[in-house]
């Protein structure tokens, strides 16, 4: 049986509409129970990442994610690990258009703002001209309390990033990944401060 928060996460994912332009992406509101989000906000991010790995390491959560994505891998592909890492950024930060590596089956970014004053600090969805490398913002997964962005980098180009932060913001977030490789502490980039666990979920 999953925890209360895991059940809530799975339900929130299933009840969120999918966007499909220019690739599949979701912005999930109320991803946690309100009291649990308040708890996450009250403790250090280093601890939050471990808690979220446990919460998302749930069969119903993983199944809910796989069900939503047409572009998700199928037919015996395996989620072999879940890992998470925290980030804090401020004014002047930007993350240029990029694609996640092929080892990432699904990528969440859990937003942990103090308020809803800076929605533009969320994850931008880009359309990229592969020849000229010019890009434009065609969607936004806004930086709002108790929400998360979700993409499936595995089978499709998923250009995304963060537009330049120009306001005095403290942008806290947790990146949480479902990966197709085993979790081996000390052998993964930034493993000294990531939280991770091996799983075996056949898609």
Set out the residue ranges of the language-model regions.
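Catalytic core of Fe(II)/2-oxoglutarate
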Residues: 102-104, 112-203
């Amino acid at each position: 049986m999953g925890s209360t928060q895991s059940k809530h996460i799975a339900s929130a994912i299933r009840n969120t509409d999918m966007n499909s332009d220019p690739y599949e992406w979701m912005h999930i509101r109320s991803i946690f129970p309100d009291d649990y989000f308040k708890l996450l906000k009250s403790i250090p991010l280093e601890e939050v990442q471990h808690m979220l790995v446990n919460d998302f390491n749930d069969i119903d959560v993983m199944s809910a994610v796989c069900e939503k994505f047409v572009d998700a891998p199928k037919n015996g592909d395996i989620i072999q690990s879940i890992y998470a890492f925290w980030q804090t950024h401020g004014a002047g930060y930007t993350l240029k258009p990029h694609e996640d590596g092929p080892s990432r089956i699904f990528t969440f970014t859990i937003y942990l703002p103090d308020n809803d004053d800076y929605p533009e600090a969320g994850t931008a969805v880009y359309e990229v001209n592969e020849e000229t490398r010019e890009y434009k913002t065609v969607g936004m997964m806004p930086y709002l309390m108790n929400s998360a962005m979700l993409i499936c980098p595995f089978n499709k180009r998923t250009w995304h990033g963060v537009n330049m932060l120009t306001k005095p913001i403290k942008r806290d977030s947790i990146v949480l990944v479902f990966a197709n490789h085993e979790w081996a502490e000390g052998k993964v980039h930034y493993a000294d401060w990531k939280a991770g666990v091996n799983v075996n979920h056949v898609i």
